[in-house]
A protein has these predicted regions:
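Structural signal for the C-terminal ends of transmembrane alpha-helices
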Residues: 83-85, 127-132, 194-199
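Core segments of transmembrane alpha-helices
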Residues: 75, 117-125, 147, 183-188
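Interfacial aromatic-anchored transmembrane helix boundaries in multi-pass membrane proteins
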Residues: 56-70, 96-130, 155-163
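C-terminal TM-helix exit segments that contain a strictly Trp-centered aromatic cap at the helix terminus
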Residues: 145-158
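Hydrophobic alpha-helical transmembrane segments
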Residues: 43-47, 76, 87-95, 114-115, ...
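Hydrophobic transmembrane alpha-helices
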Residues: 17-83, 88-92
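Alpha-helical transmembrane segments and their cytosolic interface
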Residues: 1-50, 170-204
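Internal alpha-helical transmembrane segments of multi-pass membrane proteins
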Residues: 131-148, 168
C-alpha cells in the first residue's frame, strides 16, 4: 500500500471525524444559533432584581401619607430586567415586585384598589420590555403606565382626600405626579448612566 507523503501524511482521519459537526450542521451554522438562557438562570435574575428593587424602595427621599414615595431609583432594577429579558419576563417580575410591595408596605382601602395600586401599577413597569431597542422610551412607558394605574385608583378610592372644591381627577393627578415625576427623572438618569457605562448588558 502506498504511504502518503508530505503535509497530508500527518492528518489523522479519526480527528477529522471527531471535529465534524453533528446533525449535518456546519460550524458556522452552529455558531450562529441563539443562546437560550436556562429557566434557572432567569428565575435567579428575577429574584435578584426584585430583591434589589425592594431594598432600594426603603431608601426614601420623601413619602406621602396615602402611599407613594420618591426613592433611590427603586424601579430601575425592574425596568432594566424588562429591557434585558423582554415583556414576558418583565411583566412577571414587575407584578411579583408589586405583590412584594403589598406585603411590606400595604395601604388598603378596597380589594380593587389593592389590584390597581400593587400588581397592576407596578406590573406596568414590565411594559418597558416591549421597547428593548428604545430603552428610554421603554422607561417612560413603564413608569407612565404605573402612574395611570395609581391615577385611576386615586380618582375612585381617594376622592375623599381631595381638598374642598378640587376635582378628584385633578387631586389624583397632582398627588401621584408629585412622586412619579421625580421617580421618572431619577430612573432615566440611572438607566442612562448604566447604559453609557456598559456596566450591564441589555441584550443577551
Amino acid at each position: 500500500m502506498t504511504r502518503l507523503r508530505g503535509p497530508l501524511s500527518a492528518v489523522d482521519p479519526w480527528n477529522l471525524i471527531r471535529v465534524m459537526p453533528a446533525e449535518g450542521k456546519t460550524v458556522n451554522e452552529k455558531s450562529l444559533e441563539p443562546k437560550v438562557s436556562s429557566p434557572t438562570k432567569i428565575i435567579a435574575e428575577v429574584v435578584t432584581f426584585v430583591a434589589l428593587a425592594t431594598a432600594l424602595s426603603y431608601i426614601k427621599v420623601f413619602s406621602l401619607p396615602q402611599g407613594g414615595s420618591v426613592t433611590a431609583g427603586s424601579m430601575v432594577p425592574i425596568l432594566w430586567l424588562a429591557l434585558r429579558r423582554g415583556p414576558k419576563i418583565g411583566l412577571f417580575a414587575a407584578a411579583v415586585y408589586g405583590l412584594v410591595q403589598l406585603a411590606v408596605e400595604p395601604f388598603i382601602v378596597h380589594p380593587l384598589q389593592v389590584l390597581l395600586d400593587y400588581p397592576l401599577a407596578f406590573g406596568a413597569l414590565g411594559l418597558a420590555g416591549f421597547f428593548r431597542n428604545r430603552p428610554f422610551l421603554g422607561v417612560n412607558v413603564g413608569i407612565w403606565g404605573r402612574f395611570l394605574a395609581h391615577f385611576i385608583s386615586g380618582v375612585i378610592f381617594f376622592a375623599s382626600y381631595a381638598p374642598e372644591g378640587m376635582h378628584p381627577m385633578v387631586y389624583s393627578a397632582i398627588y401621584n405626579g408629585s412622586y412619579i415625576l421625580p421617580e421618572l427623572a431619577i430612573s432615566i438618569y440611572i438607566i442612562f448612566l448604566l447604559h453609557e457605562s456598559k456596566l450591564l448588558k441589555i441584550f443577551l
